[in-house]
Amino acid sequence: MMGSPVSHLLAGFCVWVVLGWVGGSVPNLGPAEQEQNHYLAQLFGLYGENGTLTAGGLARLLHSLGLGRVQGLRLGQHGPLTGRAASPAADNSTHRPQNPELSVDVWAGMPLGPSGWGDLEESKAPHLPRGPAPSGLDLLHRLLLLDHSLADHLNEDCLNGSQLLVNFGLSPAAPLTPRQFALLCPALLYQIDSRVCIGAPAPAPPGDLLSALLQSALAVLLLSLPSPLSLLLLRLLGPRLLRPLLGFLGALAVGTLCGDALLHLLPHAQEGRHAGPGGLPEKDLGPGLSVLGGLFLLFVLENMLGLLRHRGLRPRCCRRKRRNLETRNLDPENGSGMALQPLQAAPEPGAQGQREKNSQHPPALAPPGHQGHSHGHQGGTDITWMVLLGDGLHNLTDGLAIGAAFSDGFSSGLSTTLAVFCHELPHELGDFAMLLQSGLSFRRLLLLSLVSGALGLGGAVLGVGLSLGPVPLTPWVFGVTAGVFLYVALVDMLPALLRPPEPLPTPHVLLQGLGLLLGGGLMLAITLLEERLLPVTTEG
Protein backbone atom coordinates (compact mmCIF):
# COMPACT_ATOMS: atom_id res chain seq x y z
CA MET A 1 0.00 0.00 0.00
CA MET A 2 1.42 3.36 -1.00
CA GLY A 3 1.54 5.47 2.10
CA SER A 4 3.12 8.86 1.28
CA PRO A 5 0.96 11.98 0.68
CA VAL A 6 2.39 12.27 -2.84
CA SER A 7 1.18 8.75 -3.56
CA HIS A 8 -2.29 9.63 -2.27
CA LEU A 9 -2.38 12.71 -4.49
CA LEU A 10 -1.28 10.60 -7.44
CA ALA A 11 -3.99 8.04 -6.74
CA GLY A 12 -6.55 10.80 -6.42
CA PHE A 13 -5.45 12.23 -9.75
CA CYS A 14 -5.76 8.76 -11.29
CA VAL A 15 -9.32 8.48 -9.98
CA TRP A 16 -9.99 11.92 -11.43
CA VAL A 17 -8.76 10.83 -14.82
CA VAL A 18 -10.75 7.58 -14.75
CA LEU A 19 -13.94 9.48 -14.00
CA GLY A 20 -13.43 11.50 -17.17
CA TRP A 21 -12.79 14.89 -15.59
CA VAL A 22 -9.80 15.57 -17.80
CA GLY A 23 -11.94 16.19 -20.84
CA GLY A 24 -10.89 16.65 -24.41
CA SER A 25 -10.33 14.04 -27.04
CA VAL A 26 -7.49 11.61 -26.62
CA PRO A 27 -5.17 11.52 -29.62
CA ASN A 28 -4.82 8.24 -31.40
CA LEU A 29 -1.72 6.74 -29.83
CA GLY A 30 -2.26 3.17 -30.98
CA PRO A 31 -1.15 0.69 -28.32
CA ALA A 32 -1.49 3.32 -25.60
CA GLU A 33 -5.25 3.60 -26.14
CA GLN A 34 -5.60 -0.16 -26.20
CA GLU A 35 -3.59 -0.50 -23.00
CA GLN A 36 -5.66 2.18 -21.36
CA ASN A 37 -8.91 0.52 -22.39
CA HIS A 38 -7.74 -2.76 -20.88
CA TYR A 39 -7.09 -1.25 -17.46
CA LEU A 40 -10.28 0.76 -17.61
CA ALA A 41 -12.21 -2.42 -18.37
CA GLN A 42 -10.56 -4.14 -15.40
CA LEU A 43 -11.42 -1.33 -12.99
CA PHE A 44 -14.96 -0.82 -14.26
CA GLY A 45 -15.52 -4.57 -14.20
CA LEU A 46 -14.52 -4.69 -10.53
CA TYR A 47 -16.20 -1.53 -9.27
CA GLY A 48 -18.60 -0.40 -12.01
CA GLU A 49 -22.10 -1.30 -13.11
CA ASN A 50 -23.21 -1.35 -16.74
CA GLY A 51 -20.10 0.45 -17.88
CA THR A 52 -20.38 3.27 -15.35
CA LEU A 53 -18.82 3.93 -11.96
CA THR A 54 -21.43 4.65 -9.31
CA ALA A 55 -20.90 6.36 -5.99
CA GLY A 56 -20.85 3.03 -4.20
CA GLY A 57 -18.30 1.64 -6.61
CA LEU A 58 -16.15 4.74 -6.17
CA ALA A 59 -16.37 4.38 -2.39
CA ARG A 60 -15.28 0.74 -2.60
CA LEU A 61 -12.42 1.68 -4.91
CA LEU A 62 -11.20 4.42 -2.56
CA HIS A 63 -11.46 2.04 0.38
CA SER A 64 -9.41 -0.53 -1.47
CA LEU A 65 -6.77 2.11 -2.23
CA GLY A 66 -6.63 3.22 1.38
CA LEU A 67 -8.08 6.61 0.46
CA GLY A 68 -11.29 8.39 1.31
CA ARG A 69 -10.48 8.91 5.00
CA VAL A 70 -7.68 10.36 7.10
CA GLN A 71 -5.08 7.73 7.95
CA GLY A 72 -3.56 9.68 10.84
CA LEU A 73 -0.14 9.84 9.17
CA ARG A 74 2.13 12.82 9.68
CA LEU A 75 4.72 14.00 7.22
CA GLY A 76 7.39 13.85 9.88
CA GLN A 77 6.95 10.10 10.24
CA HIS A 78 8.04 9.26 6.74
CA GLY A 79 11.45 7.77 6.25
CA PRO A 80 13.53 7.87 3.10
CA LEU A 81 11.65 6.67 0.08
CA THR A 82 12.96 3.47 -1.41
CA GLY A 83 12.88 2.32 -4.99
CA ARG A 84 13.58 5.81 -6.33
CA ALA A 85 16.69 6.64 -8.26
CA ALA A 86 19.21 8.70 -6.35
CA SER A 87 19.30 12.29 -7.49
CA PRO A 88 22.59 14.05 -8.14
CA ALA A 89 23.94 16.02 -5.25
CA ALA A 90 24.16 19.19 -7.31
CA ASP A 91 20.44 19.17 -8.03
CA ASN A 92 19.15 20.97 -4.97
CA SER A 93 15.64 21.22 -6.31
CA THR A 94 15.00 17.52 -5.72
CA HIS A 95 15.91 17.85 -2.04
CA ARG A 96 13.28 20.44 -1.21
CA PRO A 97 10.72 19.47 1.41
CA GLN A 98 7.47 18.15 0.04
CA ASN A 99 5.16 21.12 -0.32
CA PRO A 100 1.66 20.75 -1.76
CA GLU A 101 1.99 24.20 -3.38
CA LEU A 102 5.00 23.10 -5.42
CA SER A 103 2.94 21.05 -7.84
CA VAL A 104 0.46 23.90 -8.17
CA ASP A 105 3.24 26.27 -9.23
CA VAL A 106 4.55 23.79 -11.77
CA TRP A 107 1.16 23.24 -13.38
CA ALA A 108 0.44 26.99 -13.27
CA GLY A 109 3.46 27.69 -15.45
CA MET A 110 2.24 25.47 -18.29
CA PRO A 111 0.23 26.86 -21.18
CA LEU A 112 -3.38 25.81 -20.86
CA GLY A 113 -5.42 24.62 -23.77
CA PRO A 114 -9.16 24.27 -24.23
CA SER A 115 -9.25 21.25 -21.95
CA GLY A 116 -7.39 23.02 -19.15
CA TRP A 117 -4.45 20.58 -19.19
CA GLY A 118 -2.21 22.35 -21.66
CA ASP A 119 -2.36 22.49 -25.42
CA LEU A 120 -2.05 18.93 -26.58
CA GLU A 121 -1.77 20.02 -30.17
CA GLU A 122 1.41 22.02 -29.72
CA SER A 123 3.47 18.85 -29.49
CA LYS A 124 2.75 17.79 -33.04
CA ALA A 125 6.02 19.14 -34.33
CA PRO A 126 8.38 17.46 -31.90
CA HIS A 127 6.34 14.22 -31.98
CA LEU A 128 7.40 13.40 -28.42
CA PRO A 129 5.45 10.15 -28.21
CA ARG A 130 7.19 8.84 -31.28
CA GLY A 131 10.63 10.30 -30.64
CA PRO A 132 13.21 9.99 -33.38
CA ALA A 133 12.74 7.75 -36.36
CA PRO A 134 12.34 4.26 -34.90
CA SER A 135 14.79 1.61 -35.85
CA GLY A 136 13.71 -1.70 -37.33
CA LEU A 137 13.88 -3.49 -33.98
CA ASP A 138 11.97 -0.73 -32.19
CA LEU A 139 9.31 -0.71 -34.90
CA LEU A 140 8.95 -4.49 -34.71
CA HIS A 141 8.64 -4.29 -30.95
CA ARG A 142 5.92 -1.66 -31.17
CA LEU A 143 4.06 -3.69 -33.78
CA LEU A 144 4.10 -6.69 -31.46
CA LEU A 145 2.59 -4.53 -28.73
CA LEU A 146 -0.46 -3.78 -30.88
CA ASP A 147 -2.04 -7.17 -30.16
CA HIS A 148 -3.01 -7.16 -26.50
CA SER A 149 -5.52 -9.59 -25.10
CA LEU A 150 -6.72 -10.48 -21.64
CA ALA A 151 -4.40 -13.48 -21.54
CA ASP A 152 -1.41 -11.12 -21.80
CA HIS A 153 -2.30 -9.61 -18.42
CA LEU A 154 -3.03 -12.72 -16.38
CA ASN A 155 0.50 -12.97 -15.02
CA GLU A 156 1.23 -9.30 -14.49
CA ASP A 157 4.18 -8.15 -12.44
CA CYS A 158 4.89 -4.90 -10.68
CA LEU A 159 5.88 -2.66 -13.58
CA ASN A 160 8.41 0.11 -13.26
CA GLY A 161 8.33 3.34 -15.25
CA SER A 162 10.20 2.02 -18.27
CA GLN A 163 8.05 -1.09 -18.53
CA LEU A 164 4.88 0.98 -18.34
CA LEU A 165 6.07 3.32 -21.08
CA VAL A 166 7.06 0.42 -23.34
CA ASN A 167 3.68 -1.24 -22.79
CA PHE A 168 1.96 1.98 -23.83
CA GLY A 169 4.16 2.37 -26.90
CA LEU A 170 5.92 5.45 -25.54
CA SER A 171 9.61 6.18 -25.55
CA PRO A 172 11.21 5.92 -22.09
CA ALA A 173 13.63 8.73 -22.99
CA ALA A 174 10.96 11.24 -24.07
CA PRO A 175 9.21 13.46 -21.50
CA LEU A 176 5.51 12.88 -20.86
CA THR A 177 2.86 15.44 -21.59
CA PRO A 178 -0.09 15.76 -19.20
CA ARG A 179 -2.28 13.86 -21.64
CA GLN A 180 0.22 11.04 -21.87
CA PHE A 181 0.46 10.89 -18.09
CA ALA A 182 -3.34 10.71 -17.96
CA LEU A 183 -3.13 7.65 -20.17
CA LEU A 184 -0.93 5.94 -17.60
CA CYS A 185 -3.25 6.65 -14.68
CA PRO A 186 -5.59 3.67 -15.19
CA ALA A 187 -2.58 1.36 -15.22
CA LEU A 188 -1.20 2.92 -12.04
CA LEU A 189 -4.60 2.78 -10.39
CA TYR A 190 -5.07 -0.85 -11.36
CA GLN A 191 -1.65 -1.80 -10.01
CA ILE A 192 -2.38 -0.09 -6.72
CA ASP A 193 -5.71 -1.87 -6.42
CA SER A 194 -4.39 -5.29 -7.47
CA ARG A 195 -1.49 -4.91 -5.01
CA VAL A 196 1.00 -6.47 -7.38
CA CYS A 197 3.66 -4.12 -6.03
CA ILE A 198 3.11 -5.15 -2.42
CA GLY A 199 5.20 -8.21 -1.79
CA ALA A 200 4.21 -10.58 0.97
CA PRO A 201 6.83 -10.85 3.72
CA ALA A 202 9.27 -13.56 2.90
CA PRO A 203 8.95 -16.56 5.20
CA ALA A 204 11.67 -16.83 7.75
CA PRO A 205 14.41 -19.17 6.59
CA PRO A 206 14.55 -22.43 8.48
CA GLY A 207 17.04 -22.47 11.29
CA ASP A 208 20.28 -24.35 11.19
CA LEU A 209 19.82 -27.84 12.59
CA LEU A 210 23.33 -28.15 13.98
CA SER A 211 23.34 -24.74 15.67
CA ALA A 212 19.87 -25.33 17.14
CA LEU A 213 20.97 -28.68 18.56
CA LEU A 214 24.18 -27.21 19.97
CA GLN A 215 22.43 -24.24 21.58
CA SER A 216 19.69 -26.48 23.00
CA ALA A 217 22.28 -28.85 24.48
CA LEU A 218 24.12 -25.96 26.12
CA ALA A 219 20.84 -24.65 27.51
CA VAL A 220 19.97 -28.05 28.99
CA LEU A 221 23.41 -28.20 30.59
CA LEU A 222 22.75 -24.76 32.04
CA LEU A 223 19.45 -26.00 33.43
CA SER A 224 21.29 -28.77 35.30
CA LEU A 225 22.99 -26.14 37.49
CA PRO A 226 19.98 -25.64 39.82
CA SER A 227 20.45 -29.17 41.16
CA PRO A 228 23.94 -28.74 42.70
CA LEU A 229 23.15 -25.11 43.48
CA SER A 230 20.10 -26.13 45.48
CA LEU A 231 22.14 -28.71 47.38
CA LEU A 232 24.70 -26.05 48.21
CA LEU A 233 22.03 -23.63 49.39
CA LEU A 234 20.42 -26.28 51.58
CA ARG A 235 23.75 -26.91 53.29
CA LEU A 236 24.83 -23.28 53.71
CA LEU A 237 21.57 -21.45 54.44
CA GLY A 238 19.37 -22.00 57.42
CA PRO A 239 15.58 -21.79 57.54
CA ARG A 240 15.75 -18.12 58.55
CA LEU A 241 17.52 -17.11 55.33
CA LEU A 242 16.12 -19.82 53.10
CA ARG A 243 12.48 -18.80 53.52
CA PRO A 244 12.77 -15.25 52.09
CA LEU A 245 15.09 -16.53 49.36
CA LEU A 246 12.50 -19.12 48.33
CA GLY A 247 9.82 -16.43 48.27
CA PHE A 248 11.94 -14.20 46.03
CA LEU A 249 12.84 -17.07 43.69
CA GLY A 250 9.22 -18.18 43.50
CA ALA A 251 8.05 -14.68 42.56
CA LEU A 252 10.90 -14.40 40.06
CA ALA A 253 9.78 -17.69 38.50
CA VAL A 254 6.18 -16.46 38.24
CA GLY A 255 7.32 -13.26 36.51
CA THR A 256 9.59 -15.01 34.04
CA LEU A 257 7.10 -17.76 33.20
CA CYS A 258 4.22 -15.34 32.64
CA GLY A 259 6.45 -12.89 30.78
CA ASP A 260 7.83 -15.52 28.45
CA ALA A 261 4.37 -16.93 27.78
CA LEU A 262 2.61 -13.60 27.18
CA LEU A 263 5.35 -11.53 25.54
CA HIS A 264 7.13 -14.15 23.49
CA LEU A 265 5.56 -17.59 23.17
CA LEU A 266 1.99 -16.48 22.43
CA PRO A 267 2.96 -13.84 19.80
CA HIS A 268 5.16 -16.41 18.05
CA ALA A 269 2.46 -19.05 18.29
CA GLN A 270 0.12 -16.63 16.51
CA GLU A 271 2.82 -15.96 13.90
CA GLY A 272 2.91 -12.29 14.85
CA ARG A 273 5.61 -9.77 15.41
CA HIS A 274 6.61 -8.23 18.68
CA ALA A 275 6.83 -4.66 17.47
CA GLY A 276 5.85 -2.51 14.55
CA PRO A 277 8.16 -1.06 11.91
CA GLY A 278 9.35 1.63 14.30
CA GLY A 279 10.18 -0.81 17.06
CA LEU A 280 7.31 0.41 19.26
CA PRO A 281 5.88 -2.20 21.61
CA GLU A 282 2.32 -0.92 21.85
CA LYS A 283 1.05 -2.85 18.84
CA ASP A 284 1.82 -6.46 19.76
CA LEU A 285 3.14 -6.22 23.31
CA GLY A 286 0.25 -4.15 24.66
CA PRO A 287 -2.04 -7.07 25.61
CA GLY A 288 0.80 -9.02 27.18
CA LEU A 289 2.03 -6.01 29.13
CA SER A 290 -1.48 -5.25 30.34
CA VAL A 291 -1.89 -8.82 31.62
CA LEU A 292 1.46 -8.62 33.39
CA GLY A 293 0.50 -5.26 34.88
CA GLY A 294 -2.80 -6.62 36.14
CA LEU A 295 -1.04 -9.64 37.61
CA PHE A 296 1.43 -7.45 39.49
CA LEU A 297 -1.30 -5.05 40.66
CA LEU A 298 -3.46 -7.83 42.11
CA PHE A 299 -0.41 -9.38 43.72
CA VAL A 300 0.40 -6.12 45.51
CA LEU A 301 -3.22 -5.53 46.54
CA GLU A 302 -3.69 -9.00 47.99
CA ASN A 303 -0.48 -8.79 49.96
CA MET A 304 -1.36 -5.35 51.29
CA LEU A 305 -4.77 -6.60 52.38
CA GLY A 306 -3.10 -9.56 54.03
CA LEU A 307 -0.72 -7.31 55.93
CA LEU A 308 -3.56 -5.09 57.08
CA ARG A 309 -5.63 -8.07 58.12
CA HIS A 310 -2.88 -9.67 60.18
CA ARG A 311 -2.05 -6.37 61.88
CA GLY A 312 -5.63 -6.07 63.06
CA LEU A 313 -6.49 -2.96 61.04
CA ARG A 314 -10.18 -3.77 60.70
CA PRO A 315 -13.35 -1.83 61.48
CA ARG A 316 -14.38 -1.84 65.13
CA CYS A 317 -17.69 -3.52 64.41
CA CYS A 318 -15.96 -6.47 62.79
CA ARG A 319 -13.51 -6.79 65.67
CA ARG A 320 -16.33 -6.56 68.22
CA LYS A 321 -18.29 -9.23 66.35
CA ARG A 322 -15.23 -11.47 66.22
CA ARG A 323 -14.59 -10.96 69.96
CA ASN A 324 -18.18 -11.93 70.75
CA LEU A 325 -17.91 -15.06 68.63
CA GLU A 326 -14.68 -16.06 70.34
CA THR A 327 -16.09 -15.60 73.85
CA ARG A 328 -19.23 -17.53 72.91
CA ASN A 329 -17.22 -20.46 71.52
CA LEU A 330 -14.91 -20.55 74.54
CA ASP A 331 -17.73 -20.46 77.10
CA PRO A 332 -17.28 -23.54 79.34
CA GLU A 333 -21.04 -23.85 79.73
CA ASN A 334 -21.42 -24.03 75.98
CA GLY A 335 -20.48 -27.37 74.49
CA SER A 336 -19.72 -25.97 71.06
CA GLY A 337 -16.09 -25.48 71.96
CA MET A 338 -15.70 -29.18 72.76
CA ALA A 339 -17.67 -30.48 69.81
CA LEU A 340 -14.94 -29.62 67.27
CA GLN A 341 -12.17 -31.52 69.00
CA PRO A 342 -11.15 -34.61 67.01
CA LEU A 343 -11.06 -38.00 68.63
CA GLN A 344 -7.60 -39.34 69.33
CA ALA A 345 -6.75 -42.98 69.35
CA ALA A 346 -4.67 -44.61 72.02
CA PRO A 347 -0.98 -43.88 71.57
CA GLU A 348 0.97 -46.68 70.02
CA PRO A 349 4.28 -47.85 71.41
CA GLY A 350 7.00 -45.47 70.31
CA ALA A 351 4.59 -42.84 69.07
CA GLN A 352 5.51 -40.43 71.83
CA GLY A 353 9.17 -40.71 70.93
CA GLN A 354 8.37 -40.16 67.29
CA ARG A 355 6.46 -36.97 68.15
CA GLU A 356 9.38 -35.74 70.18
CA LYS A 357 11.68 -36.48 67.27
CA ASN A 358 9.45 -34.58 64.88
CA SER A 359 9.28 -31.65 67.25
CA GLN A 360 13.04 -31.54 67.40
CA HIS A 361 13.46 -31.69 63.58
CA PRO A 362 10.84 -29.60 61.79
CA PRO A 363 9.92 -30.62 58.26
CA ALA A 364 11.95 -29.16 55.45
CA LEU A 365 10.86 -25.93 53.90
CA ALA A 366 8.69 -26.29 50.84
CA PRO A 367 9.23 -23.58 48.27
CA PRO A 368 6.37 -21.52 46.91
CA GLY A 369 4.40 -23.59 44.50
CA HIS A 370 5.97 -26.86 45.39
CA GLN A 371 2.62 -28.36 46.31
CA GLY A 372 2.01 -28.80 42.60
CA HIS A 373 5.00 -31.14 42.52
CA SER A 374 4.41 -32.79 45.89
CA HIS A 375 5.34 -36.41 46.23
CA GLY A 376 3.45 -37.40 49.33
CA HIS A 377 4.87 -38.95 52.52
CA GLN A 378 5.51 -42.47 51.36
CA GLY A 379 8.66 -44.42 52.03
CA GLY A 380 12.06 -43.50 50.71
CA THR A 381 11.81 -45.76 47.65
CA ASP A 382 8.37 -44.46 46.71
CA ILE A 383 9.51 -40.86 47.07
CA THR A 384 12.56 -41.55 44.90
CA TRP A 385 10.47 -43.02 42.11
CA MET A 386 7.91 -40.23 42.33
CA VAL A 387 10.63 -37.60 42.12
CA LEU A 388 12.29 -39.43 39.22
CA LEU A 389 9.03 -39.68 37.31
CA GLY A 390 7.82 -36.16 38.05
CA ASP A 391 11.12 -34.41 37.43
CA GLY A 392 11.81 -36.53 34.36
CA LEU A 393 8.52 -35.59 32.71
CA HIS A 394 8.99 -31.99 33.80
CA ASN A 395 12.47 -31.78 32.30
CA LEU A 396 11.27 -33.54 29.15
CA THR A 397 8.65 -30.86 28.51
CA ASP A 398 11.15 -28.12 29.36
CA GLY A 399 13.66 -29.57 26.90
CA LEU A 400 10.95 -29.78 24.25
CA ALA A 401 10.17 -26.08 24.71
CA ILE A 402 13.86 -25.13 24.66
CA GLY A 403 14.53 -27.08 21.47
CA ALA A 404 11.59 -25.47 19.68
CA ALA A 405 12.61 -22.03 20.94
CA PHE A 406 16.21 -22.28 19.74
CA SER A 407 14.95 -23.55 16.38
CA ASP A 408 13.05 -20.27 16.04
CA GLY A 409 16.01 -18.08 17.00
CA PHE A 410 18.56 -17.27 19.65
CA SER A 411 16.41 -14.70 21.45
CA SER A 412 13.54 -17.18 21.63
CA GLY A 413 15.77 -19.80 23.17
CA LEU A 414 17.33 -17.30 25.57
CA SER A 415 14.01 -16.11 27.01
CA THR A 416 12.65 -19.65 27.36
CA THR A 417 15.87 -20.88 28.98
CA LEU A 418 15.83 -18.06 31.54
CA ALA A 419 12.18 -18.72 32.34
CA VAL A 420 12.80 -22.43 32.87
CA PHE A 421 15.95 -21.74 34.91
CA CYS A 422 14.14 -19.36 37.27
CA HIS A 423 11.42 -21.95 37.75
CA GLU A 424 13.74 -24.92 38.22
CA LEU A 425 15.75 -23.45 41.10
CA PRO A 426 12.91 -23.27 43.67
CA HIS A 427 11.48 -26.50 42.31
CA GLU A 428 14.75 -28.37 42.81
CA LEU A 429 15.16 -26.84 46.26
CA GLY A 430 11.82 -28.26 47.35
CA ASP A 431 12.47 -31.69 45.86
CA PHE A 432 15.93 -32.03 47.36
CA ALA A 433 14.76 -30.79 50.76
CA MET A 434 12.08 -33.47 50.79
CA LEU A 435 14.47 -36.18 49.60
CA LEU A 436 17.09 -35.23 52.16
CA GLN A 437 14.45 -35.43 54.86
CA SER A 438 13.58 -38.96 53.69
CA GLY A 439 17.20 -40.05 54.19
CA LEU A 440 18.70 -40.05 50.68
CA SER A 441 22.37 -39.21 50.29
CA PHE A 442 23.81 -36.34 48.29
CA ARG A 443 25.41 -38.78 45.86
CA ARG A 444 22.07 -40.34 44.97
CA LEU A 445 20.54 -36.90 44.58
CA LEU A 446 23.25 -35.91 42.11
CA LEU A 447 22.68 -39.14 40.17
CA LEU A 448 18.96 -38.38 40.10
CA SER A 449 19.65 -34.91 38.71
CA LEU A 450 21.84 -36.42 35.97
CA VAL A 451 19.02 -38.75 34.91
CA SER A 452 16.58 -35.84 34.79
CA GLY A 453 19.08 -33.82 32.76
CA ALA A 454 19.40 -36.64 30.24
CA LEU A 455 15.63 -36.65 29.78
CA GLY A 456 15.73 -32.88 29.25
CA LEU A 457 18.39 -33.33 26.57
CA GLY A 458 16.18 -35.88 24.82
CA GLY A 459 13.28 -33.43 24.93
CA ALA A 460 15.47 -30.71 23.39
CA VAL A 461 16.42 -33.00 20.49
CA LEU A 462 12.75 -33.85 20.00
CA GLY A 463 11.79 -30.17 20.02
CA VAL A 464 14.39 -29.32 17.37
CA GLY A 465 13.21 -32.23 15.23
CA LEU A 466 9.57 -31.18 15.46
CA SER A 467 10.37 -27.55 14.62
CA LEU A 468 12.78 -28.12 11.72
CA GLY A 469 11.14 -31.23 10.29
CA PRO A 470 9.16 -31.53 7.05
CA VAL A 471 6.04 -30.24 8.83
CA PRO A 472 7.13 -27.45 11.23
CA LEU A 473 5.21 -27.60 14.48
CA THR A 474 6.85 -24.63 16.20
CA PRO A 475 3.61 -22.60 16.68
CA TRP A 476 1.92 -25.59 18.28
CA VAL A 477 4.86 -26.28 20.58
CA PHE A 478 4.99 -22.61 21.55
CA GLY A 479 1.27 -22.54 22.28
CA VAL A 480 1.40 -25.65 24.46
CA THR A 481 4.49 -24.35 26.25
CA ALA A 482 2.80 -21.01 26.93
CA GLY A 483 -0.18 -22.82 28.41
CA VAL A 484 2.07 -24.97 30.60
CA PHE A 485 4.04 -21.94 31.78
CA LEU A 486 0.89 -20.00 32.66
CA TYR A 487 -0.57 -22.98 34.50
CA VAL A 488 2.58 -23.62 36.53
CA ALA A 489 2.95 -19.93 37.37
CA LEU A 490 -0.67 -19.05 38.17
CA VAL A 491 -2.02 -22.32 39.56
CA ASP A 492 1.04 -23.94 41.09
CA MET A 493 3.31 -21.15 42.32
CA LEU A 494 1.30 -17.94 42.71
CA PRO A 495 -1.27 -19.30 45.23
CA ALA A 496 1.54 -20.38 47.53
CA LEU A 497 2.99 -16.87 47.40
CA LEU A 498 -0.37 -15.29 48.23
CA ARG A 499 -1.34 -17.76 50.98
CA PRO A 500 1.74 -18.61 53.03
CA PRO A 501 1.41 -20.96 56.02
CA GLU A 502 2.14 -18.06 58.38
CA PRO A 503 1.97 -14.27 57.99
CA LEU A 504 4.95 -12.80 56.18
CA PRO A 505 6.74 -9.67 57.36
CA THR A 506 6.67 -6.59 55.18
CA PRO A 507 10.26 -6.96 53.85
CA HIS A 508 9.48 -10.47 52.62
CA VAL A 509 6.39 -9.22 50.78
CA LEU A 510 8.38 -6.41 49.17
CA LEU A 511 11.08 -8.90 48.19
CA GLN A 512 8.50 -11.10 46.48
CA GLY A 513 7.07 -8.11 44.62
CA LEU A 514 10.56 -7.18 43.48
CA GLY A 515 11.12 -10.72 42.21
CA LEU A 516 7.86 -10.70 40.26
CA LEU A 517 8.62 -7.32 38.72
CA LEU A 518 12.20 -8.34 37.92
CA GLY A 519 11.09 -11.52 36.17
CA GLY A 520 8.57 -9.71 33.96
CA GLY A 521 11.04 -6.91 33.21
CA LEU A 522 13.72 -9.40 32.22
CA MET A 523 11.41 -11.05 29.69
CA LEU A 524 10.36 -7.63 28.36
CA ALA A 525 13.99 -6.59 27.89
CA ILE A 526 14.78 -9.76 25.94
CA THR A 527 11.70 -9.26 23.77
CA LEU A 528 12.56 -5.65 22.95
CA LEU A 529 16.19 -6.52 22.21
CA GLU A 530 15.26 -9.48 20.00
CA GLU A 531 15.93 -7.62 16.75
CA ARG A 532 19.38 -6.62 18.02
CA LEU A 533 20.21 -10.11 19.17
CA LEU A 534 19.46 -11.67 15.78
CA PRO A 535 22.27 -9.92 13.80
CA VAL A 536 24.79 -10.76 16.52
CA THR A 537 23.99 -14.44 16.40
CA THR A 538 23.90 -14.60 12.62
CA GLU A 539 27.28 -12.90 12.33
CA GLY A 540 28.76 -15.15 14.97
From Swiss-Prot:
Chain spans, region Disordered: 78-101, 324-377
Catalytic reactions on record: Zn(2+)(in) = Zn(2+)(out)
Molecular-function annotations in GO: monoatomic cation:bicarbonate symporter activity; zinc ion transmembrane transporter activity
Domain of life of the native organism: Eukaryota
Effect of residue 375 to A: Abolished histidine methylation by METTL9
Signal peptide from the UniProt entry: 1-20
Tissue and organ distribution: Expressed in liver, kidney, pancreas, small intestine, colon, spleen, fetal liver and fetal kidney.
Residues with Phosphoserine modification: 336
Main location per the UniProt record: membrane
Compartment annotation: Basolateral cell membrane
Residues on Extracellular side: 21-212, 266-287, 466-470, 530-540
One GO-annotated biological process of the protein: eye development
Sorted UniProt keywords: Cell membrane, Disease variant, Glycoprotein, Ion transport, Membrane, Methylation, Phosphoprotein, Signal, Transmembrane, Transmembrane helix, Transport, Zinc, Zinc transport
Modified-residue entries (Pros-methylhistidine), positions: 375
Transmembrane residue ranges: 213-233, 245-265, 288-308, 445-465, 471-491, 509-529
InterPro entries according to UniProt: ZIP (IPR003689), ZIP_Transporter (IPR050799)
Associated disorder: Myopia 24, autosomal dominant: A refractive error of the eye, in which parallel rays from a distant object come to focus in front of the retina, vision being better for near objects than for far.
PANTHER family in alphabetical order: SOLUTE CARRIER FAMILY 39, ZINC TRANSPORTER ZIP5
Function noted in UniProt: Uniporter that transports zinc(2+) into polarized cells of enterocytes, pancreatic acinar and endoderm cells across the basolateral membrane and participates, notably, in zinc excretion from the intestine by the uptake of zinc from the blood into the intestine. The transport mechanism is temperature- and concentration-dependent and saturable. In addition, is also a high affinity copper transporter in vitro. Also may regulate glucose-stimulated insulin secretion (GSIS) in islets primarily through the zinc-activated SIRT1-PPARGC1A axis.
The protein's name: Zinc transporter ZIP5
